[in-house]
Amino acid sequence: MPTDFLFTSESVTEGHPDKIADQISDGVLDAIIAKDPQARVAVETLVKTGLAIVAGEVTTNCYVDIPKLVRSTICRIGYTDSSMGYDGNTCGVMVAIEGQSQDIARGVDNKKDQGAGDQGMMFGFACDETPELMPAPIHYAHAITRRLADVRRKQHPWIRPDGKSQVTVEYRDGRPARIDAVVVSTQHSDEVSNKKIQEAIREDVIAKALPKKLIDNKTKFFINPTGRFVVGGPMGDSGLTGRKIIVDTYGGMGRHGGGAFSGKDPSKVDRSAAYMGRHIAKTVVAAGLARRCEVQVSYAIGVAEPVSVMVETFGTATVPEERIALAVRKTFGLRPREITEYLNLLRPIYQKTAAYGHFGRTEKEFTWERVEEKKDALRDAAKSATPSGGRRLKAV
């Protein structure tokens, strides 16, 4: 990777159609897991003008009023008027849910040694570009969309729920030096002028969300570059669970295994192992073992022990990389049940993750972001680890 380059990441607001779908799916998960923590949940949502469809596989002994939950989620996001093309009070809700396959349950529902819910590879990433140990482009893109939603609720009622941001950061010698370009698109009511939109977004959103030291007279701003954005939300585009996986993670800076998070209970390693990968990578960076770290974990369906674990530090490690890999295996349990218990994942915490990123958050529910407990233990383990035969070992 070059040391001088531009890197761009995007974020979307909670009112983006795909994020509506994610929040509905995770809302269903939360409602079920609150009553039945051992439930198996895999729920997808499709939203379009006047309609929400919830489908998937659920095994539980509890009852949840899914149509009521769907409507309340849509209204909370801000779609409460038919003039927006989507109204949680009146939209149709269809539900198509069956039980989990017994073939899958046979390998997963083992109380002694719970197997992975599916095969696949998951990645975790961290770097020292921000206090949250997240890449700068996605961090600032999320800051804009969060601020946009806050301003919509508290200051400018003509802003509507759908919106996007994009931030391009210029790197010099591998470090963020300045913000080169900012793109903000926000849905709005029909009567507001373009001038008012430009001024409000520039002054009340961008200026409050981004650090002044990274903005200069060469920074480019693109605010509603098409000119108008009245038709938005599910009326403008259909929304589907799991279509914003890069927004959900590292903005493209770290790799992604392809599995979405929302609507999946912790037995699905697509979610739980990705959270654990982030926790491990963040702990590595917080412990001072590297400035940049990526962790890959892979699983076979029905098998508890991971098939492989890989640690990559991109030449930034302060101790030999193979020692970090060995220390990771010594310090962290990576079986699905160990991950679930360690991160305390059997709680209704997931709807909050479904907008503005699953990582780099400071709320108490995001246990995978807390690194103090294992930081010293990992550092000590890395210093004392002895690679077998002196050979370079990254996958164990």
Swiss-Prot record:
Name where it mostly resides. Answer: cytoplasm
Q: Where does K(+) bind?
A: E44
- Give the protein's cofactors: Mg(2+); K(+)
Write out the ranges of the annotated region (Flexible loop). 100-110
Q: How is the cofactor bound?
A: Binds 2 divalent ions per subunit. Binds 1 potassium ion per subunit.
Localized where?
Cytoplasm
PROSITE patterns named among the record's database cross-references: ADOMET_SYNTHASE_1 (PS00376), ADOMET_SYNTHASE_2 (PS00377)
An annotated GO cellular component:
cytoplasm
Q: Which residues bind L-methionine?
A: E57, Q100, D237, K268
Binding positions (ATP): H16, D162, G163, K164, R228, F229, D237, R243, K244, A260, K264
Q: Which reaction does it catalyse?
A: L-methionine + ATP + H2O = S-adenosyl-L-methionine + phosphate + diphosphate
Q: Which domain of life is it from?
A: Bacteria
Pathway involvement?
Answer: Amino-acid biosynthesis; S-adenosyl-L-methionine biosynthesis; S-adenosyl-L-methionine from L-methionine: step 1/1
Subunit record text = Homotetramer; dimer of dimers.
Describe its function.
Catalyzes the formation of S-adenosylmethionine (AdoMet) from methionine and ATP. The overall synthetic reaction is composed of two sequential steps, AdoMet formation and the subsequent tripolyphosphate hydrolysis which occurs prior to release of AdoMet from the enzyme.
Q: Would you identify the family this protein belongs to, as annotated?
A: Belongs to the AdoMet synthase family.
Name of the protein in question: S-adenosylmethionine synthase
Q: Which gene encodes it?
A: metK
